[in-house]
Amino acid sequence: MKHIAILKQPFFNMVLSGEKTIESRWSVNKIAPYQKIKVGDELFIKQTGKPVTVKAKVKNVKFYELNTSLAENIKTQYGKQIGIDKLKNWQEISKKKYCSLIWLGDVQEIEPIEVPRSNGNGWIILK
């Protein structure tokens, strides 16, 4: 399956530089990519308001139903690879109910691909 992840700065550049190797998605409801992405899937990555310019292969995934201590454990164990230190709203994020962790492999820049607007969604599943 193919997916598009929409990232803000500085996270987009962190993926390109290799500093960010895990994409995390935190939500109140079970929304994509929670339980919708798997190892081997192709992930296209775009910066907010711009075309897709990066693709990656999904190396690993983990899904969590959260509580406060589990969110803190994720922060401690994977925070550096996620780039949690760049988040301005960790207290709000740590109160979410679900977390998807997606390990990125074979990250490469590609020719720009225009995609339709996401209507505020940060994740799109391609059919």
Residue ranges of each PLM-predicted region?
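Extreme N-terminal starter segment of soluble prokaryotic enzymes
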Residues: 1-3
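A generic structural signal for residues embedded in beta-strands
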Residues: 23, 45-46
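Short coil-to-beta transition motif at edge beta-strands of beta-rich domains
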Residues: 34-44
